[in-house]
């Protein structure tokens, strides 16, 4: 018996020695840093726009607004943070300094800051207050510091760079851990500039010396992710509507893209041939504007709209940074906070019951070892299924215990090894045959997370086919849900809400003129001579002008600087309003100009400049 035991022991040992060790798949470049992976896992966090603009009904301050107008009466950063926590958000980024140059902290570098406001008799520090609230409630804290400064006299010279670097160092050394530093791509243009009141142009790619800025951030806050059009930590999605494309690569061509990059549409999908990992961040506001405007109190995004944004951002391999404008009291308004929290509850409800939990699927190929099919449903981020090397197409088949209703799916790649999947399909078992699930979008990339919505099916089987991949696929999670029956939502209803006096367009063909009063935002009038004259039929009292730019996403000829003239002849000359439609290219929303009531028959709207080359573009015009 003793000899038999020894023989069996030796046989087992020899068997173990000869068993082939299964190696993990080789990473495929480009790869994320550990900080970028951690950032992706945050998924949603808040943006806070709060500044002088809040108290002066502005989006982009000119740089000359009086600091004494900044006076929130009931400011409570804990109210903000508790709202974000209740909405499942993991952090917040605040506009420490927007383009107007006003600073929300008592900086030692300029007088244009909170120190010279009535708030707390000049002893306030909103950056400090928010940082403390985040620490108290375990929320991550980030800062937005605009490179463009319309107040600073030396903007455009090397002296401004020293000022900007010093501001950045103040923020990164005095307020604890920073998870994200936000560098806006808007730069150069007209401004106050210490009283010069002029337009200044800079080389957006080289002026700021972004490598120097990155060095400062990495030295002082090594775990912070840097946002800009080009990253290097995360990138702008190319629009301010909060949407990523269904095809979304976490790559950019690093030598091509820079902050202020003009080909914004490329950022919505990334570069499939990119050599640098730069994950996408979708920025959008819960209201039409970024700063608080009382006129937008009835335009807060609904729970259904916010839910749709989640699927088109987080569900498209991007993070969602959702702006919550702070009102004049210093609080998040009730409707905004209610809709935000209910949106989170709605997502939690829709994705609550994973129908694939604990089911080990059948796969056409698996690598073996730790990289097997059961890793797809074990609820462990760091375990994953992978195929053998050079096997870039395969199937994953789930058999459910019984037929279930299904209308949502979640897929995740193990991104520490790179983003791989290029095309996949989903099918369901319909008795004796497999049928394709009818999607409303292409099934191409997956990345950190892909969420699929489709019409409800009844099935006891789901099959995912990886049709093409950059290397052997590595997936760490697949889930399926029944989210209940939901309705489609629309964001482009601005046109139908425009109320206006009747008018006739004089300087275009009648059929073309109808495009700007048909309450259809998708019909756009293009005018080469960059002005339009409207005939009200008779002299009437008017006090406001409404302009809806091209909202199709094509960024056609939006007016960014305008003049409005009135009179009783077809060539009116009395100027009643002129100014700027700030940020209109990135955020093409309805613009409303209010002016002192005046009687006139004719109204002339002229573009002093456009946000993009080409003819002047008008979707709708209203006169009240």
Residue ranges and their predicted role:
Residues 397-399, 531-534:
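Short, well-ordered beta-strand elements within core beta-sheets of diverse protein domains
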């Amino acid at each position: 018996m003793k000899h038999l035991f020894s023989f069996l022991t030796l046989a087992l040992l020899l068997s173990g020695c000869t068993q082939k060790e299964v190696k993990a798949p080789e990473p495929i470049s480009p790869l994320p840093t550990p900080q970028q992976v951690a950032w992706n896992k945050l998924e949603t966090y808040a943006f806070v726009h709060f500044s002088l603009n809040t108290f002066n009904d502005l989006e982009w301050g000119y740089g000359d607004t009086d600091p004494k107008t900044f006076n929130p009466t009931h400011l409570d950063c804990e109210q903000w943070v508790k709202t974000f926590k209740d909405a499942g958000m993991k952090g917040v980024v605040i506009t420490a300094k927007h383009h107007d140059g006003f600073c929300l902290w008592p900086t030692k570098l300029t007088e244009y800051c909170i120190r010279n406001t009535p708030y707390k008799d000049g002893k306030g520090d909103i950056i400090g207050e928010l940082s403390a609230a985040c620490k108290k409630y375990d929320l991550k804290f980030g800062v937005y510091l605009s490179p463009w400064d319309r107040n600073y006299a030396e903007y455009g010279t090397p002296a401004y760079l020293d000022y900007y670097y010093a501001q950045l160092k103040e923020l990164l050394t005095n307020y604890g851990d920073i998870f994200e530093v936000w560098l806006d791509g808007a730069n150069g243009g007209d401004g106050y500039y210490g009283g010069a009141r002029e337009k200044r142009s800079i080389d957006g790619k080289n002026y700021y010396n972004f490598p120097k800025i990155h060095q400062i951030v990495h030295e002082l806050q090594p775990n912070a992710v840097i946002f800009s059009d080009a990253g290097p930590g995360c990138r702008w999605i190319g629009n301010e509507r909060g949407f990523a494309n269904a095809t979304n690569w976490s790559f950019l061509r690093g030598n091509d893209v820079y902050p202020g990059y003009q080909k914004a549409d490329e950022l919505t999908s990334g570069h499939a041939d990119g050599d640098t990992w730069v994950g996408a961040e979708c920025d959008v506001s819960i209201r039409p504007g970024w700063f608080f405007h009382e006129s937008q109190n009835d335009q807060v995004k609904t729970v259904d709209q916010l839910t749709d944004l989640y699927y088109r951002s987080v569900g498209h391999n991007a993070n969602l940074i959702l702006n919550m404008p702070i009102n004049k009291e210093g609080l998040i308004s009730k409707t905004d906070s209610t809709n935000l929290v209910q949106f989170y509850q709605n997502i939690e409800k829709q994705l609550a019951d994973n129908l694939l939990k604990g089911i080990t699927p059948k796969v056409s190929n698996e690598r073996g070892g730790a990289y097997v099919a059961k890793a797809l449903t074990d609820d462990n981020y760091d375990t994953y299924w992978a195929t053998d090397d050079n096997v870039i197409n395969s199937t994953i088949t789930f058999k459910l215990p019984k037929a279930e209703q299904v209308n949502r799916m979640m897929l995740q790649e193990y991104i520490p090894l790179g983003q791989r999947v290029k095309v996949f399909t989903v099918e369901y078992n319909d008795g004796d045959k497999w049928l394709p699930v009818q999607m409303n979008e292409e099934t191409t990339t997956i990345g950190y997370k892909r969420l699929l919505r489709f019409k409800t099916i009844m099935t006891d089987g789901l099959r995912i086919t990886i049709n093409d991949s950059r290397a052997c696929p590595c997936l760490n999670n697949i889930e399926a849900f029944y989210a209940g029956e939901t309705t489609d939502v629309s964001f482009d209803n601005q046109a139908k809400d425009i109320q206006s006096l009747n008018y006739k367009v004089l300087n275009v063909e009648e059929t073309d003129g109808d495009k700007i009063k048909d309450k259809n935002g998708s019909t756009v009038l293009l005018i080469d001579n960059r002005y339009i004259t409207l005939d009200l039929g008779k002299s009437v009292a008017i006090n406001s002008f409404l302009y809806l730019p091209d909202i199709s996403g094509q960024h056609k000829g939006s007016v960014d600087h305008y003049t409005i003239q009135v009179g009783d002849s077809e060539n009116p000359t009395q100027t009643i309003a002129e100014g700027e439609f700030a940020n209109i290219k990135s955020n093409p929303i309805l613009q409303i100009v209010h002016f002192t009531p005046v009687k006139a028959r004719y109204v002339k709207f002229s573009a002093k400049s456009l946000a993009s080359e080409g003819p002047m573009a008008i979707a709708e015009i209203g006169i009240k």
